[in-house]
């Protein structure tokens, strides 16, 4: 129906603004992890939401480049646009290898067989040197948290490799 999306974002604002106000009164921000399949999943939906909540200062972004890579969104340009709203960073890798049978939506295949899938840090296609550099350029001084989901390696291997990977990318 006409105006359905507008109605949805108005309802999101109605529900979130009181929460933002309470959190702000207590010195806490909320970092939204923009994710495919959620109400907020890219810059356009973020801007629609931010407009409806009148730019509330407690509304922030938990930046996860793997979600943007799987959507084929320019995750480095995203930082340029929204750096002042990024308050957390999930260091998570992914790869996107489309073929003649599947693309972004991956045809309901198991993770191992999807065109887009999460990988251990350094095994995917995310440019972490570019991300860490760009965040530093904008004065980012907050969390860089390992989030791990890999369809090939074990969680133990992911953790053992992930911590030194992040440490090696942090710029002093």
Spell out what each predicted region is.
Residues 16, 20, 67, 82, ...:
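Tryptophan-centric aromatic hotspots in well-structured domains and transmembrane helices
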Residues 1-60:
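Active-site acidic/histidine proton-transfer and metal-coordination neighborhood
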Residues 155-172:
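C-terminal helical cap(s) of enzyme catalytic domains, especially alpha/beta-barrels
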Residues 15-30, 130-141, 170:
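A structural motif corresponding to the C-terminal end of an alpha-helix
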Residues 9, 39, 43-47, 51, ...:
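Gly/Pro-rich active-site loop or hairpin
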């Amino acid at each position: 129906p006409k105006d359905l999306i507008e109605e949805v974002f108005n309802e999101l604002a109605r529900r979130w603004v009181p929460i933002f106000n309470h959190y702000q009164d207590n010195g806490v921000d909320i970092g939204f992890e923009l994710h495919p399949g959620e109400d907020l999943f890219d810059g356009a939906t973020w801007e629609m939401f931010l407009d409806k909540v009148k730019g509330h200062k407690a509304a922030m972004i938990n930046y996860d480049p793997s979600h943007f890579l799987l959507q084929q969104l320019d995750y480095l340009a995203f930082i340029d646009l929204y750096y002042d709203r990024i308050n957390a960073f999930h260091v998570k890798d992914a790869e996107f290898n489309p073929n003649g049978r599947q693309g972004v939506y991956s045809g309901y295949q198991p993770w191992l067989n999807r065109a887009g899938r999460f990988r251990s840090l350094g095994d995917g296609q995310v440019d972490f040197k570019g991300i860490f550099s760009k965040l530093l350029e904008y004065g980012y001084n907050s969390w860089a948290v390992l989030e791990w989901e890999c369809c090939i390696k074990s969680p133990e291997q992911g953790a053992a490799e992930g911590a030194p990977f992040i440490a090696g990318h942090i710029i002093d």
